[in-house]
């Protein structure tokens, strides 16, 4: 079956999902929404047969899609997702699900009310080597986990700077700036929680906000956690780091230490043994 899909937010994330859907064959792009003409034009070039426009509710009525991909500014995810559910559409939401616990609950309530499917697009679960590291830890290849660490180290200056071709104004909007702990830190947090599969019982955090001049929110976070199974964890998130090696979409993501070994950078290491590179299960 091929699902009719409307892309709500035609920036990089939305275009990537549209590309994957099209290549996979189980989705066809029938609608494109974005209030920014340049973004809409880029998507139209790839999907010329799709109905495009800057009125989201009107497009929902016109296109009547099976699925809506919500990939616009983070603070709009809740309203746009709920509107799609109320129009009878399943929803795939670019991470984060929402930017407040109240908005997250509103989405959950709308899903339960409509009975439709809602999923957050946590891509790291499907990417080598982090998926393979998580599966190896779940299989107890390193024994009992006592410490788990995740990182999102991403120089986002090109997205914050008006002089950059990658400038994304909503990220530095003074009223609704992107919370990088939610918008980027959700990658390591999600893969950590999936890997360890134990509830968090305690959490503590520090943050600062001076590494990105003019950014209207904190840009560096350290989060420390204790899990129900007595393991401890740490998350480091920064969007103000400086250097060419940090310009990819987040670095680090995961390290897992167990009583019988360690998983780090796609390798399984045990005392007195040569490290083994994990096999890519998607290859």
Give the positions of each predicted feature.
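Rossmann-fold dehydrogenase core element
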Residues: 105-124, 143-147
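Contiguous beta-strand/loop segments that form the cofactor/metal-binding neighborhood of enzyme cores
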Residues: 183, 189-272
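Beta-loop-alpha module in the N-terminal Rossmann-like domain of NAD(P)-dependent dehydrogenases
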Residues: 11, 17, 50-110
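C-terminal helical cap and adjacent loop that interface with cofactors, partners, or active-site loops
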Residues: 27, 281-283
């Amino acid at each position: 079956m091929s699902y009719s899909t409307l892309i709500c937010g035609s920036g990089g994330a939305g275009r990537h999902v549209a590309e994957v859907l099209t290549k996979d064959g189980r989705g066809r792009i029938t609608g494109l929404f974005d209030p920014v003409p340049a973004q809409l034009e880029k998507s139209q070039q790839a999907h010329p047969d799709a109905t495009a426009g800057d009125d989201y509710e009107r497009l929902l009525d016109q296109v009547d899609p099976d699925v809506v991909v919500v990939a616009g500014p983070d603070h709009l995810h809740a309203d746009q997702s709920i509107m799609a559910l109320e129009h009878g559409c399943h929803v795939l939401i670019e991470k984060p699900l929402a930017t407040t616990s109240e908005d997250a609950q509103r989405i959950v309530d709308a899903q339960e009310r409509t009975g439709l499917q809602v999923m957050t697009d946590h891509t790291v679960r499907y990417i080598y080597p982090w998926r393979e590291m998580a599966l190896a830890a779940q299989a107890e290849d390193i024994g009992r986990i006592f410490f788990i660490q995740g990182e999102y180290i991403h120089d986002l200056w090109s997205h914050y700077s008006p002089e950059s071709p990658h400038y994304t104004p909503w990220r530095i909007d003074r009223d609704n700036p992107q919370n990088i702990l939610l918008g980027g830190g959700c990658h390591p947090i999600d893969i950590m929680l999936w890997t360890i599969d134990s509830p968090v019982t305690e959490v503590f955090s520090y943050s600062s906000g001076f590494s990105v001049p003019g950014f209207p929110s904190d840009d560096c976070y350290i989060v420390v956690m204790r899990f129900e199974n007595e393991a401890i964890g740490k998350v480091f998130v920064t969007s103000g780091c400086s250097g060419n090696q940090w310009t990819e979409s987040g670095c680090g993501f995961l390290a897992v230490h167990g009583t019988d070994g360690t998983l780090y950078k796609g390798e399984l290491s045990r005392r007195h043994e040569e490290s083994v590179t994990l096999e890519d299960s998607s290859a």
